[in-house]
Amino acid sequence: MLLPNILLTGTPGVGKTTLGKELASRSGLKYINVGDLAREGQLYDGYDEEYDCPILDEDRVVDELENQMSEGGVIVDYHGCDFFPERWFHIVFVLKTDNSILYKRLENRGYNEKKLKDNIQCEIFQVLHEEALASYKEEIVHQLPSNKPEDLEDNINQILKWIEHWVKDHSS
């Protein structure tokens, strides 16, 4: 059976991982967190002193994921999307969180002041939404609110419904 590939993207702290893991457990799709994948495989290309974090080696990440993506049935979670091949994804969801809620979430993660400010600005200017629209066909890019627990449940149900329709439309 053909299964779709889904991209969950958005600023750090918007709830991609929570949504992705829950979605995978309810849909049977495979969940991949690109940050974890990079950590496990040391898929880095240096270190960013200013942000105090490793720099992702995007080419190696793409190489690492290629086979799984071509098989289908994968949920990918990452706070960027412009380096993934367009052909990989059947739908892209950009999660969006109110700035005050996002600020608290990132503060709880121990983000330093610069990282906090930059991520909040990223959300204000909808950088990830713009990046998704520039990287994929507009009709497959959707924004989802991610502020409260009810949003999580609504988003899961909406995406599960979409998966069901996609599978039906693509079965022989």
UniProtKB/Swiss-Prot annotation:
| Any Gene Ontology CC annotation | Cajal body
What name goes with this protein? Answer: Adenylate kinase isoenzyme 6
Q: What is the lineage of its organism?
A: Eukaryota, Metazoa, Chordata, Craniata, Vertebrata
Region (NMPbind): which ranges? Answer: 33-56
Self-association or partners: how does it assemble? Monomer and homodimer. Interacts with small ribosomal subunit protein uS11. Not a structural component of 43S pre-ribosomes, but transiently interacts with them by binding to uS11. Interacts with COIL (via C-terminus).
EC number(s) on record?
Answer: 2.7.4.3
Could you tell me what reaction this enzyme catalyses? AMP + ATP = 2 ADP; ATP + H2O = ADP + phosphate + H(+)
- Compartments, record wording: Cytoplasm; Nucleus, Nucleoplasm; Nucleus, Cajal body
What the entry lists under SUPFAM superfamilies is as follows: P-loop containing nucleoside triphosphate hydrolases
| Family to which this protein belongs | Belongs to the adenylate kinase family. AK6 subfamily.
- Write out the function statement from the record: Broad-specificity nucleoside monophosphate (NMP) kinase that catalyzes the reversible transfer of the terminal phosphate group between nucleoside triphosphates and monophosphates. Also has ATPase activity. Involved in the late cytoplasmic maturation steps of the 40S ribosomal particles, specifically 18S rRNA maturation. While NMP activity is not required for ribosome maturation, ATPase activity is. Associates transiently with small ribosomal subunit protein uS11. ATP hydrolysis breaks the interaction with uS11.
Keywords from UniProt, A to Z, are:
ATP-binding, Cytoplasm, Kinase, Nucleotide-binding, Nucleus, Ribosome biogenesis, rRNA processing, Transferase
Can you tell which superkingdom this protein's organism belongs to?
Answer: Eukaryota
Specify where the region named LID lies, as residue ranges. 108-118
Coiled-coil stretches noted in the UniProt entry, renumbered to this chain: none
Which source organism? Bos taurus
Q: Where does ATP bind?
A: 13, 15-18, 109, 148
